[in-house]
Amino acid sequence: MEDKIKHKLRIGWSYLLFLKQRVIHDRLTVSAGYMAYITLLSLVPLITVLLSVLSQFPVFSGAGDTVQAFVIQNFVPAASDAVEASLKEFISNTGKMTAVGSGFLFVASVMLISSIDRSLNYIWRVKKKRRPMYSFSLYWMILTLGPLLVGASLAATSYVTSLKIMDDEIVSSFYRTLLGWLPIILSFSAFVGLYLLVPNKKVRVTHALIGAMSAGCLFEFSKVGFAQYITQFPSYQVIYGALAAVPILFVWVYLCWIIVLIGAEITASLGEFEGWLAGKVSTNILESDIKALTEQQGLIESDSTDPESK
C-alpha cells in the first residue's frame, strides 16, 4: 500500500515537472499577452456583432443589455462600473458606422476566434490545419448560433421566473441558489467546450473535464484576488484617473488568457502519457513551428547567445 502511494506521488511529481517544462517551452505568458492584445482590439466588435444578432429577433428584445450587464458583473471583478461605462460608450459609437465599417467589425471578431483557434492548436501540437471553408463555417456558426443560445437561455430564465411555482419559498430559494452558481457553471462549460471542440485533434472528455475544472477554479480564485487587489491597492485609479479602466481591463484580460492557456496545457499534457511519465517535453513539435512562433511574437534570440555559434 505504501509503495503504491509513493509510486503515485512520483508519477504526480513527474507530471508537474513535465507540465512546468511544457509551459516554459510554449512561452505561455507571451502567448497570453498576444491574445490579450488581440482580445482588446476585437472585444468591442465581438460584443457589437453578438448584440446585433440578438437585436434581429423580437423575442430577444432587451436581451442585449441584460447579457452585457451579466457578463461584466460576473466575469470582470471590481472596477465593473468604469469598465461597463467605457464599453457602453464604445459600443454606442459603433452604431454610427457605415456598412463598410460594420464589415470590418465582423472581420475583427473573426480575428479573435481565429487567434484562439491557432493558439490552442499550437498547444496540442496540431500540424494539420482545418480547411479554410470549414474554419469559416465554424467561426460563422459561433458568431450566429452563440448569441441565439444566450438569448434562448435568457428567455427561458425569464419564463421560469414568471411561473406561479416560483412563489413557493423553498423553490424560490433553490432557484436563487442555482442562479448564484450560474456564472461558475457557464465558465466551466465554456472551458470544456473550448478544450474539446477547438483543437483539430481528438481530446478525451475526462482530460477536458480536468483541464476545465483546473481553469475554472483558477478563474474563480483570480476574480476574488483581483477584486481585492483593485479595492485594497487602488494605484491604477491614482495614476490613471478617469483612464484607469483601460489598464485594469488589459491586466484582467491578460490574467484570463493565462488561465485559459494553463487549462489547455493541462488538458493536452494529460494526453501525452509517454512524455510526462518520462518527464520530458514532447518532441512532436517541429523546429520550424517553434521558429515561426518566436518570429510572430518578436522573441527570436540573437545568434550570439547560442553556445554552439561561439
Curated annotation (Swiss-Prot):
One of its GO terms (cellular component) is plasma membrane. It is a multi-pass membrane protein. The keyword Transport does not apply. Keywords: Cell inner membrane, Cell membrane, Membrane, Transmembrane, Transmembrane helix. It comes from the Bacteria. The chain crosses the membrane at residues 34-54, 97-117, 136-156, 178-198, 207-227, 242-262. It is found in: Cell inner membrane. PANTHER family: INNER MEMBRANE PROTEIN YHJD (PTHR30213), UPF0761 MEMBRANE PROTEIN YIHY (PTHR30213:SF0). HAMAP family: UPF0761. Belongs to the UPF0761 family. This is UPF0761 membrane protein VFMJ11_0098. It comes from Aliivibrio fischeri (strain MJ11).
